[in-house]
Amino acid sequence: MNHIQDAFLNTLKVERNFSEHTLKSYQDDLIQFNQFLEQEHLELNTFEYRDARNYLSYLYSNHLKRTSVSRKISTLRTFYEYWMTLDENIINPFVQLVHPKKEKYLPQFFYEEEMEALFKTVEEDTSKNLRDRVILELLYATGIRVSELVNIKKQDIDFYANGVTVLGKGSKERFVPFGAYCRQSIENYLEHFKPIQSCNHDFLIVNMKGEAITERGVRYVLNDIVKRTAGVSEIHPHKLRHTFATHLLNQGADLRTVQSLLGHVNLSTTGKYTHVSNQQLRKVYLNAHPRAKKENET
């Protein structure tokens, strides 16, 4: 990494409020790019469009998914755009490079019975479960990102309005309501979880030492809950966000409301959940409509 790349990453962190997970992805993309430069005896400031095309081929030769390749190219395009603001002699070699089309996929989510099983795992009021349950409740009840969760302060919780104020992408604040189960888990956590009572900061979610929990720490907690839950496998923080959106739409929430709750700028981003919701609608239709199936069909 050189000083320009370090400055670029610092700008993303300070001015654009990128999460540590996203910053790590950008850093990894730059490191891989630097390795390619060294391997091909190329220089960062003389890198050309034809070199960019060769780099695209190099990425595909490593059997990466199109989504991964697209992200890596986007990282480098953004980096050169930043560099151009500092040096008028720099040309962005990635600006004309066509993004590989992203693979279409349906968001993964948990069924309601799977969520019930996860909550049952952290039902007993042990010290660890008090903290783990509040993480699970907040992520499922509000659909917030993990980067938003770890930055919640105690004063961001509004027990009168039953909701939480979070700082989303682009440093945009939004208020997200939560229900009775989530409220109760927060109250129990604040009252009985000893590490939160003795810490000298205002962060809501802490580890067993009373330190503000990290995104990595949240992922560890969620993986541990899954390991202790029979019949549930594979979890990532965004899966709970997908579950939140899917369950709301399945119960009749309109797309604009879900967009606002998730903090999406574009409605099209929220729209991907309607495909999942439509599957649920078809399932209900097939089970309920008297002429949905022929007699010999199951």
Swiss-Prot record:
GO terms for cellular component: cytoplasm. One of its GO terms (molecular function) is site-specific recombinase activity. SUPFAM superfamilies: DNA breaking-rejoining enzymes. It is found in: Cytoplasm. Pfam families: Phage_int_SAM_1, Phage_integrase. The keyword Cytoplasm applies. Residues 105-286 form the Tyr recombinase domain. One of its GO terms (biological process) is DNA transposition. Residues 1-84 form the Core-binding (CB) domain. The active site is at R145, K169, H238, R241, H264, Y273 (o-(3'-phospho-dna)-tyrosine intermediate). NCBIfam families: PRK00283.1 (NF001399), recomb_XerA_Arch (NF040815), recomb_XerC (TIGR02224). Belongs to the 'phage' integrase family. XerC subfamily. Site-specific tyrosine recombinase, which acts by catalyzing the cutting and rejoining of the recombining DNA molecules. The XerC-XerD complex is essential to convert dimers of the bacterial chromosome into monomers to permit their segregation at cell division. It also contributes to the segregational stability of plasmids. Forms a cyclic heterotetrameric complex composed of two molecules of XerC and two molecules of XerD. This is Tyrosine recombinase XerC. It comes from Staphylococcus aureus (strain NCTC 8325 / PS 47).
